[in-house]
């Protein structure tokens, strides 16, 4: 995307104990990790989740599923081209997706009214494979191949958008880190949408549920690790949802609606690798649980001054 190897993006290291900010490159992250650190990654694979749908009058819109359950989706309806403006649907109308799939509009989701409750005739995975494309926003002006939205360790497909904190890891870098004593464990959390395509609405930081899984092998590795380094806020949400009062992780398959904000006790995660997002994004709510406000704002001022890039193809931050 940027003419760089994925592990050559910039890396900002925020040391909370020393209140120090260091600028580096992602492939040098091993210099800031320790022997026996455990990287916990989200192995969910990104779906080509942006689907064309046809209304009864023949117009085409795009459906972006946020929460997928058997028989129904909570989804955004937008115009099919940038800037992907929201489209108002009518309760009772039926959308056609491909040749055989239909989606009947039941109405708006009460707690997140920009999402539409769709009663779907199929799970939509075949339609995504045949017709879908990765969800993108106006800062990505042209369609991008799905491979660019995948982490190298991605496994089972299910995320509406890429768990992007892991994108800078290459196979070579992961191998080098393992050789220096840094371990890895995989959990799974299927992401929803990062934006509802309405700045004022996004600023209200509406929360929705996401499906996550932590198996016994991952739970044991996490519980034994001297330092747990979460690769992404999705991993933080999963681990903190699964953590008992003493911080121990138990195997789980469940939905989580956990909100993590300033003052939320962090019981299972010791350090965090994350992408950079605009200072108004809900992403920063979670970071405030890790980093005191003055240091976090200084880090973001540094990022702006040094022209760090935002979003899923941008630069990275390590909080230790």
What kind of region is each of these model predictions?
Residues 1-320:
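A cross-family signal for N-terminal binding/gating loops and helix N-caps
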């Amino acid at each position: 995307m940027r003419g760089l190897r994925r592990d050559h993006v910039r890396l900002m290291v925020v040391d909370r104990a020393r209140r120090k900010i260091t600028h580096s490159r992602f492939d040098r992250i091993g210099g800031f990790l320790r022997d026996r650190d455990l990287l916990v990654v989200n192995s969910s694979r990104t779906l080509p989740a942006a689907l064309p749908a046809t209304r009864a009058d023949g117009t085409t819109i795009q459906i972006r599923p946020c929460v997928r359950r058997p028989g129904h989706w909570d989804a955004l309806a937008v115009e099919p081209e940038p800037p992907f403006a929201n489209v108002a649907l009518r309760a009772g109308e039926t959308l056609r997706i491909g040749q055989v799939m239909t989606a009947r509009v039941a109405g708006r989701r009460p707690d997140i009214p920009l999402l539409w409750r769709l009663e779907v005739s199929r799970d939509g995975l075949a339609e995504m494979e045949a017709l879908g494309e990765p969800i993108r926003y106006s800062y990505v002006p042209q369609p991008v191949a799905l491979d660019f939205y995948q982490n190298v360790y991605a496994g089972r497909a299910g995320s509406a958008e890429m768990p992007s904190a892991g994108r800078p890891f290459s196979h070579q870098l992961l191998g080098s880190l393992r050789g220096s004593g840094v371990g890895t464990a995989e959990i799974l959390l299927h992401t929803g949408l990062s934006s509802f395509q309405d700045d004022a609405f996004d600023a209200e930081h509406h929360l929705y549920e996401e499906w996550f899984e932590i198996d016994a092998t991952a739970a044991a590795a996490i519980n034994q690790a001297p330092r747990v380094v979460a690769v992404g806020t999705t991993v933080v949400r999963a681990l903190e949802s699964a953590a008992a009062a003493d911080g121990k992780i138990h195997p789980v398959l469940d939905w989580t609606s956990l909100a993590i904000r300033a003052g939320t006790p962090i019981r299972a995660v010791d350090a965090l690798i994350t992408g950079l997002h605009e200072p108004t994004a809900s992403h920063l709510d979670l970071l405030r649980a890790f980093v005191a406000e003055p240091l976090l704002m200084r880090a973001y001022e540094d990022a702006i001054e040094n022209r760090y890039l935002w979003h899923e193809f941008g630069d990275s931050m390590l909080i230790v």
